């Protein structure tokens, strides 16, 4: 009987919240080590503490965490630290999957880039966006993806992601998004702002293309230790692609639904969400056929239970017993 392969899934902008990973930071030595280590690097490099931001005692999980220049490094730190804590406990990835910004953590865990270099690249690209791009945002819509063809949406925004049949994301400038929100609200269509400051995965970041390509070209890369699945291209990479890879990751639409459809035909994987919110695990519940044989697990959640989830995932792997979280 073949061992079920594990995919570590890393989500991107929008999955962040204050106090994310706090129970693990308090109780898991490996998670805390990597958070402290990476925060010390941020302090030395930019004079800013990401830890002080994430675990600001005046902020709760309910507060909106929208500061893009710092939310990117914060997401990366939490995802990388959680992956290392899982590895130390015996839970290892056979493949990594990255959605948008999460691809940086996926690449680091796959051995292609050091966490310090990945953090540097994330901070640089956040500053490039500030210098070259207009303020904008993203809006998640809970409706059939065909709704995007409505003139009120497609004339004002661009399709940024398709997560499953009845969940998609649009990107646009602030004024246009406000109009779209009003239009959706008038029709009783569920929607939610993604806590970002720019219209990722759309033409409104194209002004940053050349400086970002130069930024990513300076990122030292090593051969992939394990395969990396890219949701921007719905492809599994066994060798490192061209230098435009990370630009495509933040510019092209996130094709999560199509990516998973391809994986379902390969094998019944164990999908382990290593993101702060468990968002990708939630999407999978709408994508995987009932008879797929796949397992879906998460550790972190804005609703709590992180320590129990961590122990359940580790215990299931040690015992070889499938356990859903």
Where are these regions (language model features)?
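FabD-like malonyl-/acyl-CoA
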Residues: 2-150, 190-196, 271-283, 295-306, ...
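Cysteine-centered functional microenvironments
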Residues: 61-71, 95, 155-171, 196-200, ...
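Hydrophobic side chains in well-ordered alpha-helices
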Residues: 121, 148, 179-180, 259
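Short, flexible, solvent-exposed loop/turn segments with mixed acidic/basic and small polar residues
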Residues: 126-132, 155-162, 236, 262
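Acyltransferase
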Residues: 140, 189-274, 278, 282-283, ...
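Phosphate/diphosphate-binding loops
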Residues: 143-145, 157-159, 166-167, 212-215
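Helix N-cap motif at beta-to-alpha junctions
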Residues: 145, 172-178
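Short amphipathic alpha-helices in soluble, non-transmembrane regions
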Residues: 151-155, 177-188
């Amino acid at each position: 009987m073949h061992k079920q392969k594990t995919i570590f899934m890393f989500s991107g902008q929008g999955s962040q919240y204050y106090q994310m990973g706090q129970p693990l930071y308090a109780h898991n030595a490996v998670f805390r080590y990597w958070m402290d280590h990476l925060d010390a690097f941020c302090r030395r490099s930019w004079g800013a503490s990401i830890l002080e931001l994430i675990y600001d005692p005046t902020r709760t999980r309910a507060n909106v965490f929208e500061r893009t220049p710092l939310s990117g490094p914060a997401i990366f730190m939490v995802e990388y630290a959680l992956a290392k804590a899982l590895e130390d406990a015996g839970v290892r990835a056979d493949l990594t999957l990255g959605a948008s910004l999460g691809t940086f953590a996926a690449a680091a865990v796959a051995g292609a880039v050091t966490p310090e270099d990945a953090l540097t690249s994330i901070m640089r690209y956040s500053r490039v966006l500030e210098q070259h791009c207009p303020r904008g945002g993203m809006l998640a819509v809970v409706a059939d993806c065909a709704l995007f063809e409505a003139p009120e949406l497609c004339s004002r925004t661009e399709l940024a992601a398709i997560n499953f049949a009845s969940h998609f994301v649009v990107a646009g400038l602030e004024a246009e998004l406000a109009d779209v929100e009003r239009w959706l609200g008038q029709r009783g269509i569920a929607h939610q702002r993604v806590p970002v400051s720019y219209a990722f995965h759309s033409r409104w970041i194209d002004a940053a293309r050349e400086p970002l390509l130069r930024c990513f070209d300076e990122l030292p890369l090593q051969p992939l230790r394990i395969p990396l699945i890219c949701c921007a291209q719905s492809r599994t990479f066994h060798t490192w692609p061209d230098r435009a890879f990370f630009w495509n990751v933040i510019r092209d639409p996130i094709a999560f639904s199509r990516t998973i459809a391809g994986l379902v035909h390969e094998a019944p994987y164990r999908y382990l969400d290593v993101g702060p919110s468990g968002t990708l695990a939630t999407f999978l519940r709408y994508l995987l056929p009932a008879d797929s044989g796949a397992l879906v697990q998460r550790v972190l959640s804005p609703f709590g239970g992180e320590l129990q989830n961590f122990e359940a995932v580790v215990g299931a792997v040690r015992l070889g017993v499938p356990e859903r979280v």
